[in-house]
């Protein structure tokens, strides 16, 4: 059996968003007050060219992003051994009531249409949901793990 060779593929912004759109698992990395990294596993989508994450205002990632909006999202494939990409960007935190329509976009980007949008909106208000919206500014290549090519 041939070894799997690591691959790195440079992508444009459009190709990046096409890669991320069907992938909904990510690790968002923010900066704590003491300067150390804080990582949060999240479900993410792409809406209007930005990576979106539903969250709550009291979560560490939200507190950190408000203080230091430069964040990183490591977007993973469903298959852990599948391709992934690191995206660096600026995060914006949107709280209720302004978060409600962006949360609709978040839901649509992951699951499509909801059977009860009024009920969904009411639940988002009741839960006090926030949206973390990350504008991609820099990204690495789409990568896969494996052996270096010299070992092929």
Task: Annotate the PLM regions.
Residues 24-25, 70, 115, 139:
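Generic structural signal for secondary-structure transition and capping sites
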Residues 23-57, 63-65, 71-75, 84-87:
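Short beta-strand segments
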Residues 20-21, 66-67, 125:
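Alpha-helix boundary recognition
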Residues 30-32, 76-78, 113-121:
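A short, aromatic/hydrophobic, helix- or strand-capping loop or linear motif
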Residues 1-11, 83-152:
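Charged, gly/pro-rich active-site loop segments
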Residues 16, 61-62:
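Short, hydrophobic alpha-helical packing/hinge segments within bilobed ligand-binding/sensory domains
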Residues 59-61, 80, 148-149:
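Short, surface-exposed beta-strand-loop junctions and turns on beta-sheet-rich folds
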Residues 2-27:
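Short, basic/aromatic recognition patches
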């Amino acid at each position: 059996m041939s070894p799997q060779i690591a691959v790195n593929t440079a992508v444009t912004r459009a190709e990046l968003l096409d890669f991320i759109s069907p992938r909904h698992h990510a690790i968002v990395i923010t900066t704590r007050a003491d300067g150390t990294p804080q990582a949060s596993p999240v479900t993410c989508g792409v809406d209007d060219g930005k990576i979106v994450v539903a969250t709550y205002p009291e979560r560490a990632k939200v507190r950190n992003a408000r203080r230091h909006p430069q964040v990183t999202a490591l977007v993973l494939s469903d298959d852990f051994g599948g391709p992934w990409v690191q995206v660096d960007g600026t995060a914006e935190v949107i709280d209720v009531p302004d978060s409600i329509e962006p949360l609709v976009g978040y839901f649509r980007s992951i699951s499509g249409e909801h059977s009860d949008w009024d009920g969904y909106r009411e639940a988002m208000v009741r839960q006090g949901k926030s949206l973390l919206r990350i504008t991609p500014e820099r990204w690495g290549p789409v990568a896969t793990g494996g052996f270096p090519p010299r070992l092929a």
